[in-house]
Swiss-Prot record:
The gene is xseA. Heterooligomer composed of large and small subunits. This is Exodeoxyribonuclease 7 large subunit. It is found in: Cytoplasm. The lineage of its organism: Bacteria, Pseudomonadati, Pseudomonadota, Alphaproteobacteria, Hyphomicrobiales. It catalyses: Exonucleolytic cleavage in either 5'- to 3'- or 3'- to 5'-direction to yield nucleoside 5'-phosphates. Bidirectionally degrades single-stranded DNA into large acid-insoluble oligonucleotides, which are then degraded further into small acid-soluble oligonucleotides. One of its GO terms (cellular component) is cytoplasm. Its main location: cytoplasm. NCBIfam families: xseA.
Length: 511
């Protein structure tokens, strides 16, 4: 059996290590040799901090890959937020992980690998978000002219918030609500986005008033310092805000993606305050100027209208001139109406007098007597006429009875008897109706006669003058002085003698 010395190297002086020993030796060698290194590479596999606060990813270049870890304490001290694909310079120490024969870098500090790398990443993000329409000018909102509440997203300490509040107080004092955030570091972007979204979710009638305009502000700094305002979640929050947003990040020469998404960009935080509120003194001066101009314009307007009114009044005829022709027509119509009424009254009086002369009492009495006589004669003649008619019919019936059978004769006799009875009843009814009509007519004529007779005039308080022959005196010219006259009143006659020169006043003229 061959001895162990037959194997190659069995008698060499190479030290023998266990797996743990060699792993520990490697760990000490790596940590001692590379205790503090700076590594440049591209971040790969970055998913943000773990729930523990640590971050695990890798640094790579074209030919190699190095695992990396940032503990929670170091993560909170970073001045920017790491992102996938960002080229960085990491400072830390190398260590191995014996359990899996892997080595990694424990990063203590990390910074972007120059402005060029950040600008390239920034340009790529800008193009991608612009393609989504987040920077579309059509989405921009107008700033309110007179906001009631202004919301400010910035650090609660520092000169920025003091400058904003001081500038607003100088221009137009109003309520300012500050949402405190970190304006640098890994948590800057999420906190700013949370603040913008939080202001938008405030109800209009809640205990905290909803701002009318937002100011997102930060002082100047390097690209790395301002990198949190290039965060995609910040850009999306500002673009989706229903409240107008003014971006005031950095100095006038600085720019971030939030400037493109905001509704207005201010060169400085102080400039943002000036954009948000007007100057109260300027408003008062403008209001006074506008008021003076309005008063002057109204004064000129009323002066012009007053002059135009006076000119129109001078050109128009006076009221007397306007009413002269209608007044003349009215007077002529009134005169014609008076004459027409007088003439019509005279015609009616003449017509009435003519009918009154025809309706003398004796004539009416004679007419009534004639009507009564006619009715009496008709009443006397009607029975005799009926008896004669019946005799004639009876003779004819008797003559025909000799030639006809009894039955038809009996039927016709009964029918004729019924007809005669009806005629007899109708005769009596006709006589009664005729007598009633004559009576009504006589009564009407009697009432008319009484109305037209001079006795009715006497009943109303008038008197009738008769001459010596007993004729009515119709005109004063028919009476001579010394004539004997008789005045008939309602209750009797009085004899008088006419005298000359006596004038009795007209009672109607004294009314």
């Amino acid at each position: 059996m061959a001895s162990d010395s037959s194997f190659p190297g069995a008698s060499s002086n190479v030290a023998e290590y266990s797996v743990s020993e060699i792993s520990g030796a490697l760990k000490r060698t790596v940590e001692d040799t590379f205790g503090h290194v700076r590594v440049r590479g591209e971040i790969s596999g970055y998913r943000g901090p773990h729930s523990s606060g640590h971050a695990y990813f890798a640094l790579k270049d074209d030919r190699a890959r190095l695992e990396a870890v940032i503990w929670r304490g170091s993560m909170s001290r970073l001045r920017f937020r790491p992102e996938e694909g960002m080229e960085v310079i990491a400072t830390g120490k190398l260590t191995t992980y014996p359990g899996s024969s892997k080595y990694q870098i424990v990063i203590e500090q990390m910074e972007p690998a120059g402005a060029g790398a950040l600008m390239a990443l920034l340009e790529e993000r800008k193009q991608r978000l612009a393609a989504e329409g987040l920077f579309d000018p059509a989405l921009k909102q107008l700033l309110p002219f007179m906001p009631r509440v202004i919301g400010v997203v910035t650090s609660p300490t520092g000169a920025v918030i003091r400058d904003i509040i001081h500038r607003i107080s100088d221009r137009y004092p109003l309520r300012v609500i500050v949402w405190p955030v970190r304006v640098q570091g890994d948590t800057c972007g999420p906190e700013v986005a949370t603040a913008v979204n939080g202001f938008n979710t405030l109800p209009d009638d809640g205990p905290i008033p909803r701002p009318d305009v937002l100011i997102v502000a930060r002082g100047g700094g390097s690209l790395e310092d301002l990198w949190g305002f290039n965060d995609e979640i910040v850009v999306r929050a500002v673009a989706a805000s229903h409240i107008p947003v003014i971006s005031a990040v950095g100095h006038e020469t600085d720019w971030t993606l939030i400037d493109l998404a905001a509704d207005m960009r201010a060169p400085t935080p102080t400039g943002a305050a000036e954009m948000a509120v007007p100057v109260k003194a300027d408003l008062q001066a403008s209001l006074a100027s506008q008021s003076a101009r309005l008063s002057s314009a109204m004064s000129r307007f009323f002066d012009q209208k007053r002059q135009a009114h006076r000119a129109a009044a001078r050109a128009m005829p006076s009221a007397d001139q306007l009413l002269a022709l209608p007044r003349r027509r009215f007077d002529e119509a009134a005169s014609r109406l008076t004459r027409a009424l007088f003439v019509n009254t005279q015609k009616k009086r003449v017509h009435f007098d003519g009918h009154a002369r025809q309706l003398s009492p004796r004539l009416l009495q004679r007419r009534l007597v004639e009507l009564e006589r006619g009715v009496t004669m008709l009443g006397q003649r009607l029975p005799r006429a009926l008896e004669a008619f019946l005799r004639e019919r009876r003779t004819a019936f008797t003559h025909r009875a000799n030639r006809l059978s009894p039955e038809p004769i009996l039927r016709r006799t009964r029918l004729t008897g019924s007809t005669l009875e009806q005629l007899d009843r109708r005769r009596d009814q006709a006589v009664r109706l005729l007598i009633e009509r004559v009576k009504r007519r006589s009564q009407e004529l009697d009432r008319l006669m009484r109305t037209l007779s001079y006795e009715s005039v006497l009943e109303r308080g008038f008197a009738v003058v008769f001459d010596a022959q007993g004729k009515p005196v119709k005109q004063a010219a028919a009476v001579s002085p010394g004539d004997a006259l008789s005045i008939r009143f309602r209750d009797g006659d009085v004899g008088v003698v006419a005298r000359a020169g006596l004038t009795i006043p007209d009672p109607t003229k004294g009314q």
